[in-house]
């Protein structure tokens, strides 16, 4: 009898673990996670980052970051230098940090609600 109970318990554990495999496969299909494995995960995306993402760069948060967001979307990283109303100092900061930016197509998953200035994270 004990052997039957043990076999039944092992069988139940094996059957219940099959559901976890399906969950792991579904998690791999997330488009945002897939994007993080590209250059987007290492650099600031000018078309998808909210204002808080620019805090890691000195002199960008919040004013210069807000200008960058206001005039997006961009087709290339260098296009950010054409923002109207940039001061000379802001232009210098942008030029010095061009290698820290990337441009990808705007994504609704990353811009939910369309508010990149105040994403509601407090």
Curated annotation (Swiss-Prot):
This protein's record includes keyword tRNA processing: no
UniProt-listed Gene3D superfamilies: Photosystem II 12 kDa extrinsic protein
GO annotation, biological process: photosynthesis; photosystem II stabilization
Domain of life the protein comes from: Bacteria
Keywords: Electron transport, Membrane, Photosynthesis, Photosystem II, Signal, Thylakoid, Transport
InterPro entries: PSII_PsbU (IPR010527)
Major location (coarse): membrane
Localization terms from the record: Cellular thylakoid membrane
Entry-linked Pfam families: PsbU
One GO location term (cellular component): plasma membrane-derived thylakoid membrane
Description of how the protein assembles with itself and partners: PSII is composed of 1 copy each of membrane proteins PsbA, PsbB, PsbC, PsbD, PsbE, PsbF, PsbH, PsbI, PsbJ, PsbK, PsbL, PsbM, PsbT, PsbX, PsbY, PsbZ, Psb30/Ycf12, peripheral proteins PsbO, CyanoQ (PsbQ), PsbU, PsbV and a large number of cofactors. It forms dimeric complexes.
NCBIfam families, alphabetized: PRK02515.1
Protein name: Photosystem II extrinsic protein U
Native species: Crocosphaera subtropica (strain ATCC 51142 / BH68) (Cyanothece sp. (strain ATCC 51142))
Gene for this chain: psbU
């Amino acid at each position: 009898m004990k052997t039957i109970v043990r076999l039944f318990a092992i069988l139940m554990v094996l059957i219940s673990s099959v559901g976890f495999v399906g969950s792991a496969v579904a998690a791999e299909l997330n488009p945002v996670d897939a994007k993080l494995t590209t250059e987007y995960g290492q650099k600031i995306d000018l078309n998808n980052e909210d204002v808080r993402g620019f805090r890691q760069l000195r002199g960008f948060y919040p004013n210069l970051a807000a200008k960058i967001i206001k005039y997006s979307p961009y087709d290339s990283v260098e296009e950010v230098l054409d923002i109207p109303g940039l001061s000379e100092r802001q232009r210098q900061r942008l030029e010095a940090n061009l290698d820290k930016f990337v441009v990808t197509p705007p994504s609704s998953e990353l811009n939910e609600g369309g508010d990149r200035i105040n994403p509601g994270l407090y």
